[in-house]
Curated annotation (Swiss-Prot):
Organism annotation: Homo sapiens (Human)
Co-factor(s): Mg(2+)
Name of the featured protein: Serine/threonine-protein kinase tousled-like 1
Main enzyme class: transferase
Catalytic reactions on record: L-seryl-[protein] + ATP = O-phospho-L-seryl-[protein] + ADP + H(+); L-threonyl-[protein] + ATP = O-phospho-L-threonyl-[protein] + ADP + H(+)
GO CC annotation: nucleoplasm; nucleus
Modified residues (Phosphoserine): 54, 77, 80, 134, 159, 174, 176, 743
Low complexity bias: start-end ranges: 20-33, 68-85, 170-192
Amino acid sequence: MSVQSSSGSLEGPPSWSQLSTSPTPGSAAAARSLLNHTPPSGRPREGAMDELHSLDPRRQELLEARFTGVASGSTGSTGSCSVGAKASTNNESSNHSFGSLGSLSDKESETPEKKQSESSRGRKRKAENQNESSQGKSIGGRGHKISDYFEYQGGNGSSPVRGIPPAIRSPQNSHSHSTPSSSVRPNSPSPTALAFGDHPIVQPKQLSFKIIQTDLTMLKLAALESNKIQDLEKKEGRIDDLLRANCDLRRQIDEQQKLLEKYKERLNKCISMSKKLLIEKSTQEKLSSREKSMQDRLRLGHFTTVRHGASFTEQWTDGFAFQNLVKQQEWVNQQREDIERQRKLLAKRKPPTANNSQAPSTNSEPKQRKNKAVNGAENDPFVRPNLPQLLTLAEYHEQEEIFKLRLGHLKKEEAEIQAELERLERVRNLHIRELKRINNEDNSQFKDHPTLNERYLLLHLLGRGGFSEVYKAFDLYEQRYAAVKIHQLNKSWRDEKKENYHKHACREYRIHKELDHPRIVKLYDYFSLDTDTFCTVLEYCEGNDLDFYLKQHKLMSEKEARSIVMQIVNALRYLNEIKPPIIHYDLKPGNILLVDGTACGEIKITDFGLSKIMDDDSYGVDGMDLTSQGAGTYWYLPPECFVVGKEPPKISNKVDVWSVGVIFFQCLYGRKPFGHNQSQQDILQENTILKATEVQFPVKPVVSSEAKAFIRRCLAYRKEDRFDVHQLANDPYLLPHMRRSNSSGNLHMAGLTASPTPPSSSIITY
């Protein structure tokens, strides 16, 4: 009988001790199951013992004999190692099971040849008893132990891998880096499977091992462990630092939050105090303005209600200041009449000249005699007045000089009275405006300093239009003054009309919101109060508009007017350079604000309610259709806006150029070039603008020819002949370096060489 393994073959009949240690395939599986369930103490668990009892009795006896022999050989020499001990050691040291040392197939066919008799069982039990009594010696003398067929070279080392013969090591698994667990081929036969009886093993079974080797030593492991401990300490230290930093940051956040709350509270207190102070100041200003208005009512005049039939009208009554001026004017007129009468009497007493002194005397005697004869002067009871005595020539000239001086003095007084009257008229205009403002403010629902949108504190009313009120307000967020325009819709309007008005206001807001230029009033905000009220917040300008200035001063110098026109044209150029371009369409003195209230300062353009957007859809080569014909201020619109036809007229930015020309003319001459004393209805009915083919300039005041030429270019009747905004911006009259013409410079140089004409005569003065 021969036993064949992966390391070689052993011939000879096996002894009973060999048979007792030769496991069957089923016993090998049971052994593996038992070893897998064996705790580190070496004693199998209850589950493993239950599996052993469930086996065939014959196999159970073989396994018992094998484990008994292994247990007895565990204390012997190093050549015969105990499998159970090795399994227990492997589980503790290298985490290998007993199956990794000798993988046994769990499958073994039951054949009649392998059945043994009762005697073999008895001999096996006898061999087991001998193994127990020998305690580590070789089993019997009839054969070898099954462990003798495997030549262990590693001695009794702790790892089973060290005791595996080199011949049966798998080269594929010797360099494997997988986890230290056994890998057993399921179909490989066990090398310890021996045939019982006289039947040899037909097919040898091969063993497959998975070997893990490492270069780590205890020092390296200790170093790695120490490094790991240091890393953990560093990480823990870093975590502690981060936790402390996090705590510090949280503490700082809490402190900053408390500080923020404190600042918010302080800010709210400041805002509340600012509101209180602003309201107090506004209240005092209202009181002072009303007191001043009451005083001016007596001095300048006031409105009185007069009944005319069934209606009542307001009539203006002048105050004592105007009455005194009227009395002074009457006294001056009376004095002038007296002086004229005395001058006539003085002319009668004018002495005759030396040549004519004798002729009147000779001729007077016959006349006297004739009168006496006819009238009977000698018997006439009436006494005739004596003829005025003739003055000497010196006396006559003396009286004549006195009368001339008195007339000159009266003329001077009359001029002063006229100047004072004009000044009082300007003050009266302010007074009338203030009276209307106070009346409108008293009737307004926003008179009690409300805060709109939780931001804008209303101070006092600036003015009132048809459907809007403009208040001076204070922005509590930005800490600046602003002008709040409150649009109030008529509650009796239809919803369609309200929607159109609101749409128009939103359109103005969208246009104005995108504009950013120093010569255009900025639009800050837009919000609604209710369904019938919405507000727009504009930049606040301290001064008045140009229309009020012209009403006060009638006109201005050419330099001041030119400065205003330059700023207007600069703003128009900006409106035509943005995309899409914009036509203002409502340029007039009322929409030009004087920042300082004077003509020598900055201006700003406002009111884009009628402006037109020249987008690609509506603007063509000839311009865009005028869809709002009839709107605007007629004195400042060009003739093409009044053309009535089947199709609407075409307009372009030349509409604003015409308006610039009219404004410049009005600033220079104090009157409008077309329809000055006409109403808008008269202008529309009489076609005044359509007939304005040429502009006529008054004689006074004197204006330079360059300014007149500039006005003619702006007021060209045909829009094809009129400048556009870009051409107007490049006009030589508006360029600072063109104020001195080349021709005048040449004449000046010629005058220096030919005549002693002063150099200033060749400079164009405005």
